[in-house]
A protein has these predicted regions:
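PLP-dependent class I/II
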Residues: 2-438
Length: 438
C-alpha cells in the first residue's frame, strides 16, 4: 500500500509540473504575440512620425506625398541648407566614389610632416588644386591649403589667426547685411576677448582695425559681394562656399588673401564635415593650423580621403563628360536642377501675387562658356502682403518653415528658403506656396 501511494504521489507531482510548464509556455506565447503586435504598431507609428518631418523623410516613398493626407499635413522644413538634392546625382553613380580604408590605415595623428598643414592628406590637397583648375573659380598658386572640419571651423580659425593677440580691445568683425545668420553667433560664441561681432559692414564707422567677412555669392540673398568698409586697418575673409557653377557664373578665379570653401555646398556632401582655406600669408596659415590643432588636433583622415575621392569623380565627370562613363558633368547636372527649381519658384511666386524675389543680371560663365543667370542655393523671399509684418510666422501658418530676416540683420518681411532639399519636399513646397492667396 505504501509503495502504491508513493507511486501515485510521483504521478500526481509529474502531472502538476507538466501542467505548470504548459501554462507557462502558453502565457509566454501570448506575451510574445502581444509584443510583436506592439512592435508592429510602434513601427507604424514611428513610420508615420518619420514621414511627418521633411528633414527626415524617406526619399523612396512609393507615392508622391502630395497625394496622401499625410503629405497635405506635413510640415515642409526649408529652414536649413541640408543639400540632399544632390542624392539624385550620386545614387546612380554606383561605386565610383566608394573607398575602402583598412583597419591599420589613418591611425597616426600625422598625414604629411613635410607639409605646413601636417594633418592634411596629400591626396586631398591634390584634388583641391585639381578641382579649382577644372572649374576656374580660385587661384591656388602661391597659396597654403588648410583643411578644416567644414568651413565653420576654418572661419573660427581665421578669426583667431587674424585677430591681434596683444590688443587691449577685441577687433571688430563685420559683414554687410543681410549676412549669414551664424556669423554673429560664431564670432561671440566663446567670448574670446580677441574679436567681437560689430554688425552690418555698411554702417560700420569706427576708426579702428576690423575684419570684414565677404560672402560671395551671398548667403542669404545670392548676390555677388565686394568689400563694403574699404578703410585702412581692414582685413578681409572671403567666404566662397557658393562660388560654384551651379549657383553663379564663374567670371574669374578668386584671387584673395584668404578664401574659404567647403564640400558641403560644392558637391552636397555636408556630412563629411570637410572644408578648406586658400591662404596667401604663411604666418596666417600657421596660426590657423595652430587653432585647429588646439581645437581638434587635426581633421579626420577618413573624411579627407572620402572627400578626395568625391572631388576626383567631380573633376573626372567634367573632363570626360559626354563619354560612356560620364554622360554629363556633375556641374551640368546640378545647374540643370537648380535652373528648373528657380523656374518653378518664380512661377509659384507670380501665381500667388503675395511675394517677390531678387532679380539677377546674367553674366558670362567661363566654365560653361555662356551667358547665364544666378540661381542661388537659397531664395531670399519678401512678403509683400500689407498686413503681414512677419513673413516667417506667416509661412509657418501654411506649414512652411523658413528662417526670418531678423537672423540676417534685416527686417522680418524677408525669409531665407533652402533650394537644396529632396525633390519631393521641394515640389510640396512649390505646390503649397502657389496656393497661398491674399
Amino acid at each position: 500500500m505504501g509503495l502504491v501511494s508513493l507511486r501515485n504521489f510521483f504521478v500526481l507531482s509529474l502531472a502538476l509540473n507538466v501542467s505548470l510548464i504548459l501554462r507557462a509556455i502558453n502565457q509566454n506565447e501570448k506575451l510574445h504575440s502581444g509584443a510583436l503586435m506592439a512592435v508592429e504598431k510602434g513601427a507604424k507609428v514611428a513610420q508615420m512620425t518619420f514621414l511627418s518631418f521633411p528633414s527626415l523623410s524617406s526619399p523612396s516613398a512609393a507615392a508622391p506625398e502630395t497625394q496622401t493626407p499625410l503629405g497635405r499635413e506635413r510640415v515642409v522644413n526649408l529652414d536649413h541648407g541640408d543639400p540632399t538634392m544632390y542624392e539624385q546625382y550620386w545614387k546612380p553613380m554606383g561605386d565610383k566614389t566608394t573607398i575602402v580604408i583598412p583597419g591599420w590605415q589613418s591611425m597616426s595623428y600625422f598625414s604629411d610632416v613635410t607639409n605646413l598643414c601636417w594633418f592634411m592628406e596629400p591626396e586631398f590637397a591634390k584634388q583641391i588644386v585639381r578641382i579649382h583648375k577644372v572649374v576656374g573659380n580660385a587661384v591656388t598658386e602661391g597659396r597654403h591649403i588648410v583643411v578644416g572640419t567644414g568651413s565653420s571651423q576654418l572661419l573660427l580659425a581665421a578669426l583667431y589667426a587674424l585677430s591681434p593677440q596683444d590688443s587691449s580691445n577685441p577687433i571688430s568683425v563685420v559683414s554687410a547685411a543681410p549676412y549669414y545668420s551664424s556669423y554673429p553667433l560664431m564670432t561671440d560664441c566663446v567670448k574670446s576677448g580677441i574679436h567681437k561681432w560689430a554688425g552690418d559692414a555698411k554702417i560700420f564707422d569706427k576708426d579702428e582695425p576690423y575684419i570684414e567677412l565677404v560672402t560671395s555669392p551671398n548667403n542669404p540673398d545670392g548676390f555677388v559681394r565686394h568689400p563694403m568698409v574699404n578703410r585702412t586697418g581692414g582685413i578681409l575673409v572671403h567666404d566662397l562656399a557658393y562660388y560654384w557653377p551651379q549657383y553663379t557664373p564663374i567670371s574669374t578665379p578668386a584671387d584673395n588673401d584668404l578664401s574659404l570653401f567647403t564640400v558641403s555646398k560644392s558637391t552636397g556632401h555636408a556630412g563629411l564635415r570637410i572644408g578648406w582655406a586658400l591662404v596667401k600669408d604663411v604666418e596666417v596659415a600657421k596660426r590657423m593650423i595652430k587653432f585647429i590643432e588646439l581645437n581638434t588636433i587635426g581633421v579626420s583622415k577618413d573624411s579627407q580621403l572620402r572627400a578626395a575621392k568625391v572631388l576626383e569623380v567631380v573633376s573626372d565627370s567634367c573632363e570626360q563628360a559626354g563619354g560612356s562613363e560620364y554622360t554629363e558633368s556633375f556641374f551640368h547636372f546640378s545647374h540643370t536642377v537648380m535652373t528648373e527649381r528657380w523656374r518653378l519658384l518664380r512661377e509659384a511666386v507670380k501665381r500667388s501675387g503675395l511675394f517677390s524675389l531678387p532679380n539677377f543680371s546674367p553674366a558670362h560663365c567661363n566654365f560653361f562658356d555662356n551667358n547665364l543667370g544666378t540661381q542661388p542655393a537659397f531664395a531670399w523671399l519678401k512678403c509683400d502682403k500689407d498686413n503681414v509684418e512677419d513673413c516667417e510666422s506667416f509661412l509657418r501658418g501654411h506649414k512652411i518653415l523658413t528662417r526670418g530676416g531678423k537672423h540676417f540683420g534685416v527686417g522680418s518681411k524677408y525669409v531665407r528658403i533652402s533650394m537644396l532639399d529632396r525633390e519631393q519636399t521641394y515640389n510640396l513646397f512649390i505646390e503649397r506656396l502657389s496656393q497661398i492667396r491674399s
